[in-house]
Amino acid sequence: MPSDNQKNTNDLPLAGPRHVAIIMDGNGRWAKSRGKMRIFGHQAGVKAVRRSVSFAVNHGLDALTLYAFSSENWNRPAQEVSALMELFVRALDSEVKSLHKHNVRLRVIGDIGRFSPRLQERIRRSEVLTEKNQGLTLNIAANYGGRWDIIQGVRQLAEQVQEGILRPDSINEASLCQYICLNDLAPVDLVIRTGGEHRISNFLLWQIAYAELYFTDVLWPDFDEQVFEGALNAFAQRERRFGGTTPIDADAS
């Protein structure tokens, strides 16, 4: 995770993003190109996660959200899913102390109730250990889907209406937003997708309404500081209008 010999330089490009989300794609193809099983690529992908978290800490990002396991990933072969779950457990066990040491707050977003009790306990333990940290907020999206996120928020609003707490005609974007994952963080400014595909794959559908999108052919295990830096530099060149006609300085909003 973050290196002890690197300082938090806060050297983001001018008007750099505060919250970056990454769709980590390409582990399987990376492994296949080397004649290995897909899990070999997922294991290599953990190293890319370490590099990315370290980069985010040392460059002063407020939040980094990583798409680790989508709700659709259960359709993969059972052996691969099982291996991914075990890898998740091992990664939590091996990395959470380092995250805590570097003032990183870890949160897992998604429907974690489908995970094994063992994995759910690791998640809870890791979140509790780091919950008071004030540095980077690292969000791991696991068994997460953007549609699920919106639906679970709507259900909570519906319960309030049913109980007479909320009037249907008073519901607005702000009402729903407070029940959507990541509502307490800065909006997602930049979405990076590795692996060459140009799609969102049901990731943070509500939260990325005005995010800039950056696609790279680099497979996730090869994603490093240089590629991350390139994405931030590309972001700095964008003119963000948020639906208007005049570019807006996100730092001033």
Swiss-Prot record:
Tell me, what is one Gene Ontology molecular-function annotation carried by this entry?
Answer: ditrans,polycis-undecaprenyl-diphosphate synthase [(2E,6E)-farnesyl-diphosphate specific] activity
Q: Where does substrate bind?
A: 26-30, 38, 42, 70-72, 74, 76, 193, 199-201
Q: Which InterPro entries does this UniProt record tie to the protein?
A: UPP_synth-like, UPP_synth-like_CS, UPP_synth-like_sf
Keyword annotations from UniProtKB, A to Z: Cell shape, Cell wall biogenesis/degradation, Magnesium, Metal-binding, Peptidoglycan synthesis, Transferase
Cofactor(s) it depends on: Mg(2+)
A Gene Ontology cellular-component term? cytosol
Query: Catalyses which reaction?
Result: 8 isopentenyl diphosphate + (2E,6E)-farnesyl diphosphate = di-trans,octa-cis-undecaprenyl diphosphate + 8 diphosphate
Superkingdom classification of source: Bacteria
EC number, UniProt record = 2.5.1.31
Record's cofactor remark: Binds 2 magnesium ions per subunit.
Q: How does it assemble?
A: Homodimer.
Similarity comment text for this entry: Belongs to the UPP synthase family.
Functionally, this protein is described as follows:
Catalyzes the sequential condensation of isopentenyl diphosphate (IPP) with (2E,6E)-farnesyl diphosphate (E,E-FPP) to yield (2Z,6Z,10Z,14Z,18Z,22Z,26Z,30Z,34E,38E)-undecaprenyl diphosphate (di-trans,octa-cis-UPP). UPP is the precursor of glycosyl carrier lipid in the biosynthesis of bacterial cell wall polysaccharide components such as peptidoglycan and lipopolysaccharide.
Q: What is this protein called?
A: Ditrans,polycis-undecaprenyl-diphosphate synthase ((2E,6E)-farnesyl-diphosphate specific)
Q: Which gene encodes it?
A: uppS
